A protein has these predicted regions:
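Core catalytic alpha/beta fold that binds nucleotide/phospho-ligands
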Residues: 1-157
Length: 157
């Protein structure tokens, strides 16, 4: 299983006031809020953690069929700016984030070794959806392959 998320930092800066009253309380646990406050760049930390939660949520939704908005139940465990885990209800997902000047991209997987198996999809490949969850069909085996798609602002992955 895989999940991914992209945050357009330019768009986030323009459209999301993460410093507004109670914003952090609604989305981040106390431990995560400490990471944000103590960070060299708190704004980047906010969107890094948010991206990790979103990527992990995509796997959780795919595994359980549960849809909803419950960011406080998704808890980030931060190793460093690029690696960590996200846990929810006894499930743990591994995350890998890439921070660039104008974006943060996070990929989440259920097993660390799956990071090595991730491939980009040719834009010409037809992506199908079942219950809102995207997949492709392998031409040879006819097996369904799970995919994860993110697009926000000027980015698509």
């Amino acid at each position: 299983m895989i999940g991914n998320d992209i945050v357009d930092l330019v768009l986030a800066k323009k459209e999301s006031n993460w410093k507004r009253n109670r914003f952090l309380d609604k989305i981040f646990t106390i431990k995560e809020q400490v990471l944000i406050v103590d960070a060299e760049n708190p704004e980047i930390m906010v969107w890094n953690l948010w991206s990790r939660k979103e990527a992990a949520y995509k796997i959780y939704n795919r595994e359980t069929g549960i849809r909803g908005y419950f960011p406080l139940q998704l808890e980030c465990f931060y190793e460093n700016a690029t690696l960590g885990t996200v846990s929810i209800k006894g499930k743990t997902y591994f995350t890998q984030s890439k921070i660039e000047n104008d974006s943060i991209c996070t990929i989440a997987v259920v097993e660390k070794e799956y990071f090595k198996k991730i491939k980009s999809i040719n834009p010409a490949v037809k992506i199908l959806k079942k219950n809102g969850i995207p997949f492709t069909i392998d031409c040879n085996s006819k097996m369904e392959n799970p995919v994860s798609i993110s697009h926000l602002g000027g980015f698509c992955e």
